[in-house]
Amino acid sequence: MERGKKKRISNKLQQTFHHSKEPTFLINQAGFLSSDSYSSLLPETESVNPGEKIKTDTQKKRPGTVILSKPSGRRIISESQLSPPVIPARRPGFRVCYICGREFGSQSIAIHEPQCLQKWHIENSKLPKHLRRPEPSKPQSLSGSGSYSLQASNEAAFQSAQAQLLPCESCGRTFLPDNLLVHQRSCKPKGEGARAPQSNSSDHLTGLKKARSGTPARPRTVICYICGREFGTLSLPIHEPKCLEKWKIENDRLPVELHQPLPRKPQPLPTAQSSQAGPSQAQLVSCPNCSLTFTSDRLLVHQRSCKTQPQGPKDQNLTLGSKGSLKESTNSKQQKNRAAPSVTDRVIHATQEALGEPGGTLCL
């Protein structure tokens, strides 16, 4: 019964709400409502017993609602502007090694320097004596504070490392002593115009003089007194006996009139090369046709292609030739003499006609 009454009241209120046009109607009607009517406006689940509430929950499950409070964009912008900027930590000051000139941290430089000095001693002992350098001394810390003292100490350490460099003789570039030897293998001198390396210390000058004297020069050569070719001082004693044997074999193959006496080894003189060049020139034989000088074995090869003949043998052939050949030569001369006046006769005859003189035969 009670449920029916409540439903009727709620239906009447809904109908009057839809048909009423005044907003104050609900307020007036709310005053006449009893406590039971207030409970009827609430959901049914709230007015039901606990046992009945469980049954209704199993039948209808309504999802729960969550309210999210979204902050305004202006607030986020203002908060980001008010936050201070993040400043990165200051980079530690690097220190320059006074031996190799590289940079290290303030804590690792103390570990590096003893190892670098030990390596320097090992590499310095492997170098030639004229390229060895004195042990580099650590520059004293300068008085100052902050970044100025660090910069000054790094500059002094860098100058100490640069003092270990040696200039190249060819190009003038500076290298460490161990790197200089590697560079000199591929560095080619540019000529006399290459700039000379400048060095302030006397150690550089003495080292450069020793380095120049220590560069490998061309080995001295000696001329063979038989063939006239150049050989080294060590290979010449091996060459001379073989060259003399070869000379004897070639000399025996020549005609008898071209045989040469056995060459003699010259005595050593201060001018060794000039004294040895003389006997080798004495072994040369002149060609009878062109008067060029050759060695005895090369003369035969030259005579095969030499076609020029001297004038002396031709005159002898004319004088010692047969009578027929002499007659032929005289006849040819007479024919030439006859042919010559015929040309002159024509010239004289033409001149006489031009002058108006009577033509006639020219008597010779």
Swiss-Prot record:
Binding site for Zn(2+) 3: 224, 227, 239, 243
Entry-linked PROSITE patterns: ZF_C2HC_C3H (PS52027)
Region Disordered, residue ranges: 43-64, 127-148, 187-215, 259-280, 305-345
Keyword Zinc: yes
Zinc finger (C2HC/C3H-type): 93-122, 164-193, 220-249, 283-312
Binding-site residues, Zn(2+) 1: 97, 100, 112, 116
Disulfide bonds: none
Entries under Pfam families matching the protein: zf-C2HC_2
Gene Ontology molecular function terms on file: zinc ion binding
UniProt entry keywords in alphabetical sequence: Metal-binding, Repeat, Zinc, Zinc-finger
Binding site for Zn(2+) 4: 287, 290, 302, 306
Biased composition (Polar residues): 306-334
Names of the cofactor(s): Zn(2+)
Residue stretches of biased makeup (Low complexity): 138-148
Positions contributing to Zn(2+) 2 binding: 168, 171, 183, 187
PANTHER family, sorted: C2H2 ZINC FINGER CGI-62-RELATED, ZINC FINGER PROTEIN 474
Protein name: Zinc finger protein 474
